[in-house]
């Protein structure tokens, strides 16, 4: 499995829709911890995902959210 950082961004006017998209959507990311700037006014969310490829990583998100998300492949690093 590969590691992905899922970077999602939406306009403040789309915040409610971005969260509502999770209703009735089944994913291991649902209920998982994520980092968000919505409460800080920037409307960005980051998730960690393990998946075989970019498509599989984005499939862990509802379509509305995935369409506004960049899946970035990452690898662990020990800071020197």
What kind of region is each of these model predictions?
Residues 1-80:
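Conserved, structured core segments of small domains
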């Amino acid at each position: 499995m590969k590691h992905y950082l899922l970077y999602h961004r939406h306009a403040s006017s789309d915040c409610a829709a971005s969260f509502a998209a999770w209703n009735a959507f089944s994913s291991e990311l649902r209920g998982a911890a994520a980092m968000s700037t919505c409460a800080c006014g920037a409307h960005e969310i980051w998730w960690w995902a393990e998946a075989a490829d970019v498509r599989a990583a984005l499939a862990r998100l509802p379509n509305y959210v995935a369409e506004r998300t960049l899946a970035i492949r990452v690898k662990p690093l020990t800071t020197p």
